[in-house]
Amino acid sequence: MQENVLTGKVALITGGARRVGAEIARTLHAQGMNLVIHYRSSRDDAHALQAEFEKHRPKSVALVMGDLLKVAQLPGIVEEAVAAFGRLDALVNNASSFYPTPVGAATEEQWDDLIGTNLRAPFFLAQAAAPHLKKTHGCIVNIADIHADRPIKRYPIYCAAKAGVVLLTKSLARELAPEVRVNAVAPGTIMWPEGEAEVSAAQKQEMLARIPLQRTGSPDDIASTILFLIRDATYINGQVIAVDGGRTVVA
């Protein structure tokens, strides 16, 4: 494998300031990439991450704030990313909303939020980024979910949005080839959700019992798969890679 093949290349990571997004950023930066980290409300986390990375490599991280629900802002996010370093080699559509919307209680606002962050924003960001990625023969990595085709109760809108991400990934892979590769990662249980989607200890045990490896994954499992798709997978296009400890092979 060629060493430092990513040095000087540029990745835009949405929702890159915390949780899995921060680990993706950490992994790509360690491989020599310059980063544009998008955030909406995690300003302090974003600036802390930038400071951490730039101790090792000054002027290697730019930050861009934006609301992914506002489609008119999305081309500007991409343009800021390109302006920061003069090129764009990878778009990682990581940002996501996740919470229950049981039938009978779901609202139009929840629909707009879940579809907007998980499906609409990745498409319009990809559309804006495509001309720049074609110039560099770059790639797009979307974040799907193993529940895109194995829906979980009480999450119909989220599951529908992620199902859309799967087909969007395959469609973009055809639309943007041969210059741009488009793939997706479908996480299983990686980090326990926060806030409204938080699960009980009993629910955690029930979920773990269905995973052949009998444990959760880590953010590094997702980040290393994304690194593989960006750096090494030059002949992989239109694929969705499950990172789930074997959950999808269990009935």
Per-segment meaning from a language model:
Residues 10, 17-19:
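Conserved glycine-rich cofactor-binding loop
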Residues 126, 161, 169:
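Active-site helix of classical SDR
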Residues 102-103, 107-115, 196, 203, ...:
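Substrate-binding pocket helix/loop in short-chain dehydrogenase/reductase
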Residues 131, 173-178:
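Alpha-helical segment proximal to the catalytic Tyr-Lys
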Residues 211-222:
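A conserved structural motif in NAD(P)-dependent oxidoreductases
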Residues 2, 150, 210, 227, ...:
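Short C-terminal tail/terminal secondary-structure segment
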Residues 177-181, 236-238:
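Short, small/polar-rich loop/turn modules that mediate ligand/substrate recognition or access, typified
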